[in-house]
Amino acid sequence: TAEEVLINWEELKKKEKRQETQTEVMQSVPEALPALIRARKVQKKAADVGFDFPVTADAMRKVYEEVQELEQAVRENGEIEEEFGDILFALVNISRFLKINPEFALTKAIKKFINRFEYIEKSALLEGKALSEMSLEEMDLLWDEAKIKLNPMQ
């Protein structure tokens, strides 16, 4: 099967690189890769030997757990950056389950954010206001409007 071929290929690469443990395989994932892609590759290497959640829902629960740990770290002046990283890592794992590229997903989210922000700014100008003169509540109302009007699914 295709899966067996892939497993054999991975074993050959492991021998070629003289990697004896799965940890060494993970450590060989280039640090020069974008962090989201590297995280996904490392997670895949762990999954290859069975260290993985059985279902997507379990991976999602892990995100909630990590968010709670970040909240606790913020309250207690703990390891905030570390906990934030754990959330990102857990989110990347969900992307692996859903078979989406986390870099592409984030790039699309950034574009969507900018488009919605542009809507707010243009709407403010039409009302003769600068954004700096508007309250957050006014901008939030325009943001909600932008979500509806700029939604390509409608």
Language model region names:
Residues 1-84, 88-154:
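Flexible "arm" and connector segments at domain edges
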